[in-house]
Design a protein with these regions (language model features):
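Hydrophobic alpha-helical transmembrane segments of multi-pass integral membrane proteins
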Residues: 17-21, 103-107, 146, 150-151, ...
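An internal, D/E-rich "acidic patch" concept
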Residues: 58-114
């Protein structure tokens, strides 16, 4: 067990290093000078050089790369060019909002997909099974950048039930969570249906029915419990997709999370803030996948062999 987890952990380190390194290289290859952009056209060469030196941008890119990783190892992600604040402080303020949105989206997806998937499996090939399959397929076809404006138009503008943007209350969280969790709910509904159909065909289910157990006990106590093991694993693996989707969702709803911060940092070419955001998102993805592997290995010891 310990050897398996150690191996999985060692695999994550080069992946995280590669992601941050590629982002570092790409953002430095984009034409233009962020210092010039920040100071404006009226800045003198002396002003530009002075500020480049202050942010460590006056040395070769290789040296900047080494200096950046030295800072990371000491917990220093640099200083934002645009906001003139430590990147760690900015991310610490924004990250909890993204985590809140992502967890809410996962809860929404599970609350929708588990009952829908179970219902679809129990009513296989009947009208409600076909209807749920059609709705889940429709959900897969709707990206969050299309679903978000539709929800805003209907619930916020036409019905005036929920706020359009902002954060701070449960009402502000509802539309972004549904937007972000919609596609995941569609994926999980199909997975729950498939897993339930497989479990309901097993011998132990026939034995439980032969003992006279009620259908609800057979379905929810026996079949669903086993069917959820692979489903919950997919939930963990889909966490990265939710983080990526949060970038668009936060922009649509003006949610003050790290996704919206990343877009803003990229548009202003804020080197250190972009790298800090990507590092944080990558680290979150790696940690969640590691925990998913850990809990799945507990539930299914065969994968450790």
């Amino acid at each position: 067990m310990l050897r398996y987890l150690t191996t999985r952990l060692l695999y994550t380190i080069p992946v995280l290093w590669l992601v941050v390194s590629v982002v570092f290289l790409l953002i430095h290859l984009v034409p233009g000078d962020p210092i010039q952009q920040m100071l404006g056209e009226g800045a003198t060469a002396s002003d530009i050089q002075s500020l480049r030196h202050a942010y460590g941008l006056d040395v070769p890119i290789g040296r900047q790369y080494v200096n950046y990783w030295k800072g990371v190892l000491h917990g220093d992600l640099g200083r934002s060019l645009r906001l003139d604040q430590p990147v760690t402080r900015i991310i610490a303020q924004r990250y909890p909002w993204t985590l809140q949105l992502t967890l809410a989206a996962m809860i929404v997806a599970l609350l929708i997909s588990i009952p829908a998937g179970v219902r679809s499996a129990r009513r296989r090939n009947r009208w409600d099974d076909r209807a749920l399959s059609f709705v889940s397929l429709l959900g897969l076809s709707f990206p969050n950048f299309a679903l978000g404006p539709i929800l805003i138009l209907f619930f916020a503008i036409q019905l005036a039930l929920l706020p359009v943007s902002g954060a701070g209350t449960v009402a502000h969280l509802i539309l972004p969570a549904i937007t972000l969790g919609g596609s995941l709910a569609a994926i999980l509904t199909r997975m729950v249906r498939t897993a339930m159909l497989e479990e309901l065909s097993q011998d132990y289910i026939r034995t439980a029915r032969a003992k006279g157990l009620s259908e609800n006990v057979v379905v929810y106590k026996h079949a669903l419990r086993n069917a959820l093991v692979p489903v919950l694993t997919v939930v963990g693996l889909q966490f990265g997709a939710l983080l990526a989707g949060a970038i668009v969702t936060e922009t649509i709803f003006s949610w003050p999370g790290i996704g919206r911060l990343t877009i803003s940092a990229i548009s202003s070419r804020d080197y250190y803030l972009v790298q800090g955001c990507i590092l944080t998102i990558g680290l979150t993805y790696v940690v969640v996948n590691f925990l998913t592997d850990f809990f799945y290995s507990l539930a299914n010891p065969r994968i450790r062999q």
